[in-house]
Curated annotation (Swiss-Prot):
Residues 9-72 form the S5 DRBM domain. It comes from Fusobacterium nucleatum subsp. nucleatum (strain ATCC 25586 / DSM 15643 / BCRC 10681 / CIP 101130 / JCM 8532 / KCTC 2640 / LMG 13131 / VPI 4355). This is Small ribosomal subunit protein uS5. GO terms for cellular component: cytosolic small ribosomal subunit. Part of the 30S ribosomal subunit. Contacts proteins S4 and S8. The keyword Transmembrane does not apply. The gene is rpsE.
Length: 164
């Protein structure tokens, strides 16, 4: 185990659902929670928790989110380049914005971008607007972000050649 402080992450509940399973003996009710954790400096994690009670489901979702943390490349409180992410029937498009624009995003993508530490961004959701799909598409798109230095290293070029 790594010695990390758990309080370094902000936690947000994106969705709490009451779900039921019908059996021969009647309906069994349980809860499903989608949670996100982030440090506001480029790290984000998403987790799903299921349990018979809401508090247990929340605890499981946050624990799962902390296990799935990924590092995102940011540039001046925005993203370095345009990107699109897809999850299920959801397609999410994101573009960098000038300082002072704010987070122009809806649904779960706004909450995730705020947890990551993005302050200026433009987004557009196409297809399904289901919170779970939007959250996953947002994280998948953020994982694809690369800085100019990373792209130059992958292509075997210098940074000035990439930016020109």
């Amino acid at each position: 185990m790594l010695n990390r402080e758990d309080n370094q992450y902000q936690e947000k509940l994106l969705k709490i659902s009451r779900v039921s399973k019908t059996t021969k003996g009647g309906r069994t009710i349980s809860f499903s929670v989608l949670a996100a954790v982030g440090d506001g400096e480029g790290k984000i994690g998403l987790g799903l928790g299921k349990a018979n009670g809401v508090p247990d489901a929340i605890r499981k979702a946050i624990a799962a989110a902390k296990k799935n943390i990924v590092k995102i490349s940011l540039k001046n409180n925005t993203i370095p380049h345009e990107i699109a992410g897809k999850w299920g029937a959801t397609t999410l498009w994101m573009a960098p914005a000038y300082e002072g624009t704010g987070v122009i995003a809806g649904s779960a993508s706004r909450e995730i971008l705020e947890l990551v530490g993005v302050h200026d961004i433009l987004t557009k959701i196409k297809g399904s607007r289901n919170k779970h799909n939007v959250a996953r598409a947002t994280v998948e798109a953020l994982k694809l972000l690369r800085t100019a230095e990373q792209i130059a290293a992958l292509r075997g070029l210098e940074v000035k050649d990439i930016l020109s």
